[in-house]
């Protein structure tokens, strides 16, 4: 099978522990793009947090794509055209806010290059801002500040307590929206039906490819749907067990250029 689209998760997959793309991985990914294979970067990060990696991989030159907010937005990185967008229902924001507040957790969302929150000094808010190379904007009242359309909210906090809140919120919201953790300390709150596989189906239709022509590589629970959906689903060696169990192939870890290894094996060889 000649694969024409390579879909990559970022954290724990494309990037190493330092959140960097290694020179070998970059060189390999430029090589496959020169051969005509398109790359899509699919992440829970906001668009602003994915952009620097898209620039490093020259996605503009090679006509690649970004799936931000776990697939809530799809952007053609050459033209910067927004191909697809699914927004959070503002009616649900008061409930999300109350859940965070009663547990003394921070809740955040995004506005351009800013992470918006009432708790700018929270250690997990700082993690999210650092991860995405975004500035933190302190707001006095989250609900008053968020009047613009948003693709997701994030509640952040100590993992054990956050796991309990996740169960409670999932039961309350499962018919209305997606509730899941992308990291033990990050609880993602997104529009219902938003996952990487669903958004990739939209992208494939737009660009005239089939899922059999797609490789997807990831490590986390939010990568599971796209790994199951892709013609070739690949888990990183450092992936969660459930992801490995559902993958067609397990590559090396993100500390061992696992993405480059898979691209060399299935695209360049």
Name each region found by the language model.
Residues 1-5, 22, 188-269:
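Mg2+-dependent phosphoryl-transfer enzymes with acidic/Ser/Thr/Gly-rich catalytic loops
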Residues 2-18:
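Asp-based phosphoryl-transfer active-site loop
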Residues 23-123:
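Active-site phosphate-binding/coordination module
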Residues 25, 50-54, 165, 169, ...:
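Hydrophobic packing residues within well-ordered alpha-helices of enzyme cores
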Residues 32, 43, 70, 153, ...:
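Residue-level signal for inorganic ion chemistry
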Residues 36-40, 64, 152, 212, ...:
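Short active-site oxyanion
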Residues 62, 70, 172-175, 229-230, ...:
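Short, structured coil segments at secondary-structure junctions
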Residues 99-217:
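Conserved acidic, metal-coordinating active-site core of Asp-based
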């Amino acid at each position: 099978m000649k694969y024409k689209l390579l879909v990559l998760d970022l954290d724990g997959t494309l990037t190493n522990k330092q959140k960097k793309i290694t020179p070998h991985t970059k060189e390999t990914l430029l090589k496959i793009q020169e051969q005509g294979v398109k790359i899509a970067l699919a992440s829970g990060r906001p668009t602003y947090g994915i952009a620097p990696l898209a620039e490093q991989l020259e996605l503009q030159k090679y006509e690649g794509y970004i799936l931000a907010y776990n697939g809530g937005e799809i952007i053609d990185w050459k033209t910067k055209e927004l191909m697809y967008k699914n927004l959070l229902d503002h009616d649900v924001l008061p409930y999300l806010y109350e859940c965070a507040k009663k547990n003394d957790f921070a809740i955040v969302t995004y506005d351009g290059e800013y992470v918006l929150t009432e708790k700018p000094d929270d250690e997990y808010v700082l993690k999210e801002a650092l991860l995405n190379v975004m500035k933190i904007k302190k707001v006095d009242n989250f609900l008053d500040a968020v009047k613009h359309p948003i693709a997701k909210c994030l509640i952040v906090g100590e993992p054990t307590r956050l796991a309990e809140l996740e169960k409670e919120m999932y039961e309350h919201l499962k018919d209305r929206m997606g509730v899941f953790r992308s990291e033990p300390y990050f609880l993602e709150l997104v529009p219902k039906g938003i996952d990487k596989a669903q958004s990739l189906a939209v992208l494939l239709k737009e660009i005239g490819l089939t899922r059999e022509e797609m490789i997807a590589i990831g490590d986390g629970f939010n990568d599971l749907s796209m790994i199951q959906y892709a013609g070739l689903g690949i888990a990183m060696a450092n992936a969660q067990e459930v992801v490995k169990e559902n993958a067609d192939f397990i590559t090396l870890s993100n500390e061992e250029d696992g993405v480059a290894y898979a691209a060399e094996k299935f695209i360049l060889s």
